Swiss-Prot record:
<feature type="binding site" description="in other chain">
    <location>
        <begin position="41"/>
        <end position="44"/>
    </location>
    <ligand>
        <name>IMP</name>
    </ligand>
</feature>
<dbReference type="InterPro" id="IPR018220">
    <property type="entry name" value="Adenylosuccin_syn_GTP-bd"/>
</dbReference>
<keyword id="KW-0342">GTP-binding</keyword>
<comment type="pathway">
    <text>Purine metabolism; AMP biosynthesis via de novo pathway; AMP from IMP: step 1/2.</text>
</comment>
<feature type="binding site" description="in other chain">
    <location>
        <position position="128"/>
    </location>
    <ligand>
        <name>IMP</name>
    </ligand>
</feature>
<dbReference type="InterPro" id="IPR042110">
    <property type="entry name" value="Adenylosuccinate_synth_dom2"/>
</dbReference>
<keyword id="KW-0460">Magnesium</keyword>
<feature type="active site" description="Proton donor">
    <location>
        <position position="44"/>
    </location>
</feature>
<feature type="binding site">
    <location>
        <begin position="408"/>
        <end position="410"/>
    </location>
    <ligand>
        <name>GTP</name>
    </ligand>
</feature>
<dbReference type="GO" id="GO:0000287">
    <property type="term" value="F:magnesium ion binding"/>
</dbReference>
<keyword id="KW-0658">Purine biosynthesis</keyword>
<feature type="binding site" description="in other chain">
    <location>
        <position position="302"/>
    </location>
    <ligand>
        <name>IMP</name>
    </ligand>
</feature>
<feature type="binding site">
    <location>
        <begin position="15"/>
        <end position="21"/>
    </location>
    <ligand>
        <name>GTP</name>
    </ligand>
</feature>
<feature type="binding site">
    <location>
        <begin position="298"/>
        <end position="304"/>
    </location>
    <ligand>
        <name>substrate</name>
    </ligand>
</feature>
<dbReference type="Pfam" id="PF00709">
    <property type="entry name" value="Adenylsucc_synt"/>
</dbReference>
<comment type="function">
    <text>Plays an important role in the de novo pathway of purine nucleotide biosynthesis. Catalyzes the first committed step in the biosynthesis of AMP from IMP.</text>
</comment>
<feature type="binding site" description="in other chain">
    <location>
        <position position="238"/>
    </location>
    <ligand>
        <name>IMP</name>
    </ligand>
</feature>
Length: 419
């Protein structure tokens, strides 16, 4: 029997595209949902029957009672954060598994993150302050602590104290105090007690699901392509690989294991934090998009910067990820605009370009305007959309060279058009 392929959901803007709703909507078709990278800086908001769920580490498939949910080795895991998140749900044993190879994001990582951002002043990247960068830095520097070490909290405590002693001068500069050893040990024992039942070799779990059990597996990325450490708007990026290729390293699978790739995009664009954003609208339309779309970060609560759909960035991200189709989210937020705009090219040094240069700071958007429409909210069939909205979708398909296969017309799970 040939191995089954794993399908992949990937954000192809600056994160916050609505991946959570799509994973939740599709999860009933899958036996396993896997998260491959990032940490509790990422946030999914899912509405089911009027109830809001905020997820940061747990895969969105958790709302499907029959799905197994996996947090892979590429994730940096905050024990405190995931334990709080788990309180939203019951009977998680056997439904949630955490890689023993995932790295720990501990409280001092957040302190380092916040201290460094403060030192940068007006040159700060605008991180969430959740310690993601420092946790990944420890991983790359080969001094990180892994989730599997929680199974022996006494030994882990010794390692953390040793780490502080070896980096005493650095911590002193950042005004971070060494933890009390006894208090630290009790804290780690608490984490160990609550998380030990969920810690396992998740790579073997996924291999078995694909190779032997013929399970349907869905892979879930965090953040978005434009925040990728290599291919995003560096240095205003996250610390992990957010593209489809990153799912392989973050879960321990190979490229041949990937089947269908679905790219998630909003019908407009948003960004949290600093960094270039070519199609940002600083006027009344941008403000209106933010108000209608309730554009506040799930993790930070910060207002998101808003602008028009950037087809240049979308085409780039779709090609980079190998997207088979797009899921177009929040189409209803554009309801009522007299006209809507699409960024179809950039101007750089007086010349028109249709690609992303390494630095987006100096590009200016070139727009095409299209007639707006009255209402798409709640539509569940393509035929129910106004002609202008249908034309808008076709324009996006044409410019991005990727078909739109899913359309979301409200936050509710069922207000989704599958083409």
């Amino acid at each position: 029997m040939p191995s089954r392929k794993a399908d992949l959901i990937v954000g192809i803007q600056w994160g916050d595209e609505g991946k959570g709703k799509i994973v939740d909507r599709l999860a009933k078709e899958y036996d396993m949902v896997c998260r491959s990278q990032g940490g509790h800086n990422a946030g999914h908001t899912i509405w089911v029957d009027g109830v809001r769920y905020a997820l940061h580490l747990i895969p969105s498939g958790i709302l499907n009672p029959k799905a197994v949910n996996v947090i892979g080795n590429g994730v940096v895991l905050s024990p405190e954060s995931i334990i709080k998140e788990m309180l939203q749900f019951e009977n998680l044993e056997g439904r949630l598994f955490i890689s023993d190879k995932a790295h720990l994001n501990l409280s001092y990582h957040s302190l380092i993150d916040q201290a460094r951002e403060k030192l940068k002043g007006d040159k700060a990247i605008g991180t969430t302050g959740k310690g993601i960068g420092p946790a990944y830095s420890d991983k790359i520097n080969r001094v990180g602590m892994r989730v599997g070490e929680l199974l022996n909290p006494e030994k882990l405590c010794e390692r953390i104290v040793e780490h502080f002693e070896q980096n005493r001068d650095i911590f002193a500069i950042l005004n971070i105090n060494m933890p009390n050893k006894n208090e630290l040990l009790e804290e780690l024992k608490g984490y160990s007690e609550k998380l030990s039942p969920f810690i396992t070799d998740t790579t073997q779990l996924i291999w078995r699901a694909l190779d032997k059990e013929n399970k349907r597996v869905l892979l879930e990325g965090a953040q978005g392509t434009m925040l990728d450490i290599d291919h995003g708007t560096y240095p205003y990026v996250t610390s992990s690989s957010t593209i489809s290729a990153g799912a392989c390293t973050g879960l321990g699978i190979n490229a041949k294991d990937i089947g269908k790739v679905i790219g998630i995009v909003k019908a407009y664009c948003t960004r949290v934090g600093n960094g270039p954003f070519p199609s940002e609208d600083l006027g009344k339309d941008g403000k209106l998009l933010g108000e209608r779309g309730h554009e506040f970060g799930t993790t930070t609560g910060r207002a998101r910067r808003c602008g028009w759909f950037d087809a240049v960035a979308c085409r780039y991200a779709s090609r980079l990820n190998g997207c088979d189709e797009l899921a177009l989210m929040k189409l209803d937020v554009l309801d009522g605009f007299d006209e809507v705009k699409v960024c179809v090219a950039y101007e750089l040094n007086g010349a028109q370009i249709d690609y992303l240069p390494a630095n987006l700071d100096d590009v200016k958007p070139i727009y095409k305007s299209f007639k707006g429409w009255d209402k798409t909210e709640g539509a569940r069939r393509f035929e129910d959309l106004p002609k202008e909205a249908q034309d808008y979708i076709k324009i996006i398909e044409e410019i991005t060279k990727t078909k739109v296969g899913i359309i979301s017309t409200s936050p509710e799970r069922e207000d989704t058009i599958i083409l």
